[in-house]
Amino acid sequence: MRHKKRGRRLSRDTSHRQAMIKNMLVSLFKHERIETTVPRAKELRPVAEKVITLGKRGDLHARRQALSILNGDKEVVHKLFTDLAERNKDRQGGYTRILKTRFRYGDCAPMSFIELVERDATSAAE
């Protein structure tokens, strides 16, 4: 029985699932909006919220933790600690939103956009 087991396996082993979440996290912060399946978006959301909170903290230890989580991508970490932290400074959580969009052709998987609530206007045009 799997009563009270948190999280979704997403048909992957642990290391593959963690790598996928980290890569999706980097893409989310880089593009500020990505399209993925609904279960993946629901798994990504709490991780993204925690990393944005690290960005708002702004100290050296938080920067090193974020660098570790974001696969060492210094460009994304810089954006997180400058742009995203500044945009979300007055928001107490709820930095992301999930918008259900369609069903994917081929396997009929439910798709959704996961995006940052305080998105940049220029990234919306992309």
Curated annotation (Swiss-Prot):
Q: Does the keyword Electron transport apply?
A: no
Which SUPFAM superfamilies does this one have? Prokaryotic ribosomal protein L17
Q: Which Pfam families match?
A: Ribosomal_L17 (PF01196)
Q: Name one GO molecular function term.
A: structural constituent of ribosome
Output the GO biological process annotations, alphabetical, semicolon-separated: translation
Show the coiled coil region(s). none
Checking PROSITE patterns in the record gives: RIBOSOMAL_L17 (PS01167)
User: GO CC annotation: what is one?
Assistant: cytosolic large ribosomal subunit
The answer, when asked if Hydrolase is one of the entry's keywords, is: no
The UniProt entry, under NCBIfam families, shows:
L17 (TIGR00059)
Q: What family name appears in the similarity comment? A: Belongs to the bacterial ribosomal protein bL17 family.
Record PANTHER family: LARGE RIBOSOMAL SUBUNIT PROTEIN BL17M, RIBOSOMAL PROTEIN L17
Stated name of the protein: Large ribosomal subunit protein bL17
Instruction: Specify the species.
Output: Magnetococcus marinus (strain ATCC BAA-1437 / JCM 17883 / MC-1)
Instruction: State the taxonomy lineage.
Output: Bacteria, Pseudomonadati, Pseudomonadota, Alphaproteobacteria, Magnetococcales
